[in-house]
Amino acid sequence: MQQYSSKYNKQAILLVNLGTPDNYDTKSIKRYLKEFLSDPRVIEANPILWKIILNLIILPIRAKKNIHTYKTVWNKQHNKSPLLFYTENLADKLDKKLDNYIVDYAMRYGNPSIESKIKSLQDQGATEIIIFPLYPQYSATTTATVYDEVYRVLSKLRWQPTIKGINPYYDNKFHIQTISQQIKEHLKKLDSTPDTVLFSFHGLPKEYFDKGDPYYCHCYKTYRLVKEELQNEYPNIDFELSFQSRFGPKKWLEPYTTVKLEEFAKQNKSVVIIAPGFSADCLETLEELAISEKENFIKKGGKEFSLIPCLNDSNQHVDMLYNIIDEEICLKK
């Protein structure tokens, strides 16, 4: 009987994040936004009408508008967006921690693509690939579309690898403990105790939730579990929930982060804000929260504004992902 090389019996873990433009020029941003906003999971609209609106109105305007915002947060030392930089480092660190697995990363939109990385992992001998979407809270607009793309890629392969997936980890004990500890460590660094810790999650059109998307419930449970971990130790801090990054005229999940921050500002409160739905810092945290929302908050009378960084490529994040993977698939030691 023919002996096959042991090369073709490896397991791999593919971390998947949202995506980023290749650069902060108009062409790169437009290409990225077109792929992202053309996904029917993201924008539920008449496809013909939406294509016209997207190409004639939204892309020309938003591509130019976003040049400055991307340039503001871009990691110019490595010529990468923060999201790409941190996700790449995170995969490298996890790869070093997992001797018996190949660990790599991909982006749902932009580069490196899921298709290119599945091919790369197969070329390295992976016959089983564990997909790990880096979204703690499930949504059809994020987690589901990752698997849509994975299975689209598989449909073209003659030799398909076995695919397994890591569940959303919005209520996983390792995730809750890590976020709670992250907040504690940040609070210790402050000169005074803030009035409020605001949990700001990326928003979602309310109609998506009404149709059955569990995202709001997952966000609320993450918020509630972390709050329960902290409220006894910090009885004088209010813990609140909000949603950011609203896009378009439709009603989105409420309360809106902008509205909550303006309310706190009018009361001359000090605020610490954390965005636990983002695994790595990106435009929504480094520009929208750290710059735009902070400026508006201070302008409206807010006292102190402090943003907790995402877990990024920290050792705590690596350990958390390791423990979640181990809990789900019993890692080979």
UniProtKB/Swiss-Prot annotation:
Residues binding Fe cation, per UniProt: 202, 284
Biological process terms in GO annotation: heme biosynthetic process
E.C. numbers: 4.98.1.1
Subcellular location, record wording: Cytoplasm
Keywords: Cytoplasm, Heme biosynthesis, Iron, Lyase, Metal-binding, Porphyrin biosynthesis
UniProt-recorded Gene Ontology molecular function terms: ferrochelatase activity; metal ion binding
Cystines in this chain: none
Pathway given in the UniProt record: Porphyrin-containing compound metabolism; protoheme biosynthesis; protoheme from protoporphyrin-IX: step 1/1
PROSITE patterns xref list: FERROCHELATASE
Catalysis performed (reactions): heme b + 2 H(+) = protoporphyrin IX + Fe(2+)
Major localization class: cytoplasm
Record carries keyword Lyase: yes
A GO cellular component annotation in the UniProt record: cytoplasm
Pfam families from the UniProt entry: Ferrochelatase (PF00762)
InterPro entries: Ferrochelatase, Ferrochelatase_AS, Ferrochelatase_C, Ferrochelatase_N
Family: Belongs to the ferrochelatase family.
Function noted in UniProt: Catalyzes the ferrous insertion into protoporphyrin IX.
Protein name: Ferrochelatase
Organism encoding this protein: Francisella tularensis subsp. holarctica (strain LVS)
